[in-house]
């Protein structure tokens, strides 16, 4: 058996560069509070192993969409990050305004006009114990990467879902957007094993909760837009905006109402439309659930209209868009 090499610093950095995989071309820029700046070399986009985000999951995160050089709903996503941090008892490493500026400047350093901007707030590095008392202080990371593209068939033909057997998170943890996503991952794996596109969490009372990392909404046969309350699920930023769109459709006569209330599974199965909603998937129609057709088994008109409204909003809603300061980008000289 060959002896494991002990690298010099230069050899280790060279090894990191050689180990870069093909998908790393989709990673454009990363800010690390540990470094105190931004790197654009994917080989250097690393997090210390002793950061409690890595070995304890004591961290929260959020993601904003970068579209046409603008960050969509940045402030709403940042506010949720801070609220999640409070729930996880994580002190902010910087004031809110500074966190916001770091996100914007990292987006600028990427020189990309479209993509995803994800950011993490962690208990930070300092050891391998359980509690954060050993940590030297909270850490903050930002990465700009190519946005996940879902198959066009999801929108043109509709999605197929199954009821997940994975236990739903308790409300306290469901409402915090933490890095503990094992149940969410298992939902997706289970769905793929059952030849479906995604899964649906059902709570202990038999009420619809949410999908893997998306909200679930319905249109009833009498054209009422339905969504579960947010007391035991994550308060999605996108679904809150879509609820605004749904209210507009009520005013325009496309819907007869909007209702936030518990949705029993059997009632949900009889809906005219079902859809998944989130910042990456946007609004995707569901045409089959546990092998049973939803409505007529085809993508519905309300889901299509809400997707159209979302796309328009990401390009023209000035109150939801924050410009990225590309012209202010500076690079280190070291």
Model-derived regions: residue spans:
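Non-catalytic accessory segments adjacent to catalytic cores
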Residues: 108-110
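Short, well-ordered coil loops that connect the C-terminus of an alpha-helix to the N-terminus
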Residues: 112-113, 252
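Short, glycine/charge-rich beta-strand/loop segments that flank catalytic centers
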Residues: 95-104, 114-129
């Amino acid at each position: 058996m060959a002896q494991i090499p002990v690298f010099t610093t230069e050899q280790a950095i060279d090894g990191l560069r050689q180990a870069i995989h093909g998908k790393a071309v989709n990673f454009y820029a990363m800010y690390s509070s540990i470094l105190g700046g931004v790197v654009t070399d994917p080989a250097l986009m690393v997090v210390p192993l002793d950061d409690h985000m890595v070995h304890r999951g004591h961290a929260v995160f959020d993601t904003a969409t970068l579209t046409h050089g603008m960050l969509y709903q940045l402030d709403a996503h940042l506010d949720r990050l801070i609220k999640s941090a409070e729930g996880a008892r994580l002190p902010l490493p910087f004031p809110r305004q500074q966190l916001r500026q770091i996100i914007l400047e990292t987006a600028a350093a990427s020189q990309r006009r479209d993509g995803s901007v994800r950011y993490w707030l962690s208990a930070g590095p300092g050891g391998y114990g359980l509690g954060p008392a050993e940590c030297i202080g909270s850490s903050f990371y930002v990465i700009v990467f190519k946005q996940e593209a879902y198959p066009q068939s999801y929108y043109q033909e509709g999605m197929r879902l199954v009821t997940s057997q994975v236990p739903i998170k308790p409300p306290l943890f469901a409402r915090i957007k933490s890095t503990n996503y094992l149940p969410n991952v298992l939902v997706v794996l289970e769905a793929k094993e059952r030849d479906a596109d995604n899964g649906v969490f059902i709570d202990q009372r038999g009420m619809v909760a949410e999908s893997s990392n998306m909200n679930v909404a319905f249109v009833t046969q009498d054209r009422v837009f339905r969504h579960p309350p947010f007391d035991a699920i994550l308060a999605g930023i996108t679904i809150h905006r879509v609820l605004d769109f749904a209210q507009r459709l009520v005013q325009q006569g496309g819907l007869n109402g909007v209702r936030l209330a518990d949705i029993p599974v059997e009632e949900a199965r009889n809906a005219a439309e079902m859809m998944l909603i989130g910042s990456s998937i946007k609004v995707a129609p569901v045409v089959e659930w546990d092998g049973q057709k939803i409505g007529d088994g085809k993508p519905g008109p309300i889901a299509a209209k809400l997707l159209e409204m979302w796309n328009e909003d990401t390009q023209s809603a000035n109150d939801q868009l924050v410009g990225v300061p590309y012209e202010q980008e500076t690079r280190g000289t070291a």
